[in-house]
Amino acid sequence: MIEPAQAMVSKTEVDKRRLRTMLQRDDIAQIIEDYDRMKLRIGMTASHSALDICDGGIEEGFPTVAYCQEGRHKTYANYFKTKRSSSGRVLRGMVDKAIVMPSFNDVMNDSMQVEMRKRNVVYIPNRSFTSYSSIEDVENKFRVPLFGSRNMLRMEERTEEQDYYWILDKARLSYPEAI
């Protein structure tokens, strides 16, 4: 008979397995080789923080692509659509392109990722990205360059043992007390 403790896989073993399947830096470096670095675009999940990302992207001179869920797209496709002068200067707005999909998770479709790569999209992972798509899919299947560390996204999850509070604790930095 197998004892329950023996049947359980250690957390360290689970972490090792996860790292073996996670897209590696070399995988993304290979993808970036095909990018036209003069035509980079900023992409993001079109949720509450997307306008902040778009505003920053436009301010830094990057075209923006908001990946929207059908029925929640008008804010990005209509109200904040970028209007540019004939020289390309932004007159108003901050969303150059709104891609409307049935579900936010459709960014995980291979065909959608191919289109993102053709557009030279660098994806900014906001909280909604890892809420609507599983963290495992983001780590293992999202073959689009991300701004930031793919390895650190798991720490944003509130259910992880080693979450952002754990990092703050280890760094001996203060944070609000849980109520």
Task: Outline where the language-model segments fall.
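Positively charged, low-complexity intrinsically disordered leader regions
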Residues: 4-31
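A composition-driven signal for long, intrinsically disordered, charge-rich low-complexity tracts
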Residues: 5, 61, 148-150
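A generic short-segment signal for beta-strand/edge and adjacent turn/coil regions
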Residues: 9-15, 32-36, 91-93, 117
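N-terminal phosphate-binding or glycine-rich loops at protein starts, especially the Walker A/P-loop
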Residues: 25-60, 67-68
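Generic beta-sheet signal
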Residues: 40, 64, 121-123
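Conserved N-proximal alpha/beta basic substrate-recognition cap immediately N-terminal to
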Residues: 48, 56, 69-179
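A generic structural motif
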Residues: 60-64, 93-94
